[in-house]
Amino acid sequence: MYALADVNSFYASCEKVFRPDLRNKPVVVLSNNDGCVIARSPEAKRLGIKMGLPWFQLRSMKFPVPVIAFSSNYALYASMSNRVMVHLEELAPRVEQYSIDEMFLDIRGIDSCIDFEDFGRQLREHVRSGTGLTIGVGMGPTKTLAKSAQWASKEWPQFGGVLALTPGNIRRTEKLLSLQPVEEIWGVGRRISKKLNTMGITTALQLARANPTFIRKNFNVVLERTVRELNGESCISLEEAPPPKQQIVCSRSFGERVTTYEAMRQAVCQHAERAAEKLRGERQFCRHIAVFVKTSPFAVTEPYYGNMASEKLLIPTQDTRDIIAAAVRALDRVWMDGHRYAKAGCMLNDFTPTGVSQLNLFDEVQPRERSEQLMQVLDG
């Protein structure tokens, strides 16, 4: 059995945790540079505020009550996500962080001590008391069914945020799947759901009853796996340690166009610093650092310019100082005066789990002494 814990309205809820005065008030979180709405509290949803609504439009709209908007704070959201993960690990033996606000739990055998849904309510209370955040919990014999149960726990308030689909209650599972649109199934996107609809498959139950071989032939092995999971056959295992990333990218569009080298250098250094921090979080070292800059392709009255340069290091590193220095060298090669830059970023790749490298006899470059200890202090 698997459980899926999903934090309700995660970004908006994180902002509310530290502002008790905002309880029961509509809150939205905006994208980078306050471009558009990327998260809404339940109160904001009830006002009809849509995802992706531009901030300038929202600001001019009239509502019965004031809508409070926050700029996105990803450091806060990552910290709160880690706190939720810690609290779940205190009650479940194995936990996989699927996304910043979703975690899968292995709950096999727990029903010998406590009812599955009672355990789900226990999880909710433990996380709420420890973090101030509310989670929904869906449970099932496969990850896909746990995801469907979690969807239903949100869709119908009478479940109280907790729903278990057990192998012993097939009728309940079939009833839920008959009510779940095929586009709401985990891993079924809009394009695939449209093709399924043309075949007369509009609900999760209809997909579950489809022939797996037929699905594989007409779609792919991934959707075949989904069909098997909907029938209670576990095909997707828990990943306690997700595979290491192959690339880290830190970039951002500028709120105002950048026209000076010093302002661009400062932005690139910030991106490089954040990328180095993420690299250490992955417990990886990198050998390849790239920087890109570009103007806006939509500014038709201005000449477009975009370029990228990279630096390859002799010794893999995760030291912020090395990564910033390489990023600045790359920036110096692509910077051109006279442009109004709209975006810049830093990319790291060519990862290795250690900082060890075979050096040439005549190489003068040596690893920095006590670098690891210094970076640990920097990361706090």
Predicted features by range, described:
Residues 1-228, 238, 277, 365-380:
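Gly/Gly-Pro- and Ser/Thr-rich, intrinsically disordered tail segments characteristic of DNA damage-repair
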Residues 28-30, 70, 106, 227, ...:
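Residues in well-ordered beta-strands of folded domains
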Residues 98-102, 140-143, 284-288, 339-343:
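Short Gly/Ser/Thr- and Asp/Glu-enriched loop/turn motifs at secondary-structure junctions
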Residues 103-109, 308-314, 357-363:
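Short, hydrophobic beta-strand segments
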Residues 109-110, 141-146, 294-299, 349-354:
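Short, internal active-site loops enriched in acidic
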Residues 134-136, 290, 345:
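Residues at or immediately flanking beta-strands
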Residues 184, 194-340, 356:
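DNA-contacting surface of Y-family translesion DNA polymerases
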Residues 322-379:
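C-terminal hydrophobic structural anchor segments
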